[in-house]
């Protein structure tokens, strides 16, 4: 699926979930983490030049696909619903919030000289310091 199709499918799932909310906020977070992860990842571009995928977009996608709870974008959607908004208009903001958090984690791991994040070696150890810094900066720009 292309990114636009992923976004449409993800939004349809989130709209269905919003129409039938679970009994607890915790259930909402658990039930919707995967679909929001797919939505967030659909905002990661791909490049026409293979180096862009190798050295920038690929590392960010790999990092982003390694999970996380996706609480921040889910809270953004919940806030949108709480004030009567249309969550379709909150998708880019929700994704930007998660990408900002991703950038903070990548840069924090460098500053702290961390060795693992989410059970795997940190990006600066697997991809190199330069790629990790640039990937974190890319995530900030999204």
Label for each model-derived stretch:
Residues 2-47:
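N-terminal amphipathic/basic leader segments beginning at the initiator methionine
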Residues 41, 49-142:
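Mg2+-dependent prenyl diphosphate-binding active-site environment of isoprenoid biosynthetic enzymes
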Residues 1-2, 119:
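Accessible peptide chain termini
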């Amino acid at each position: 699926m292309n990114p636009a199709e992923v976004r449409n499918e993800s939004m349809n799932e989130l709209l269905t979930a919003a129409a039938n909310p679970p009994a607890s906020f915790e259930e909402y977070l658990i039930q919707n983490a995967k679909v929001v992860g797919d939505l967030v990842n659909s905002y990661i571009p791909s490049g026409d030049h293979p180096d862009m995928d190798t050295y920038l977009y690929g590392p960010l996608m790999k990092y982003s696909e390694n999970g996380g709870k996706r609480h921040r974008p889910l809270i953004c959607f919940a806030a949108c619903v709480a004030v009567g908004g249309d969550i379709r208009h909150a998708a880019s903001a929700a994704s930007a919030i998660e990408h900002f958090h991703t950038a903070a984690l990548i840069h924090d791991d460098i500053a702290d000289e961390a060795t693992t994040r989410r059970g795997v070696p940190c990006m600066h150890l697997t991809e190199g310091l330069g790629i990790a810094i640039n990937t974190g900066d890319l995530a900030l720009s999204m």
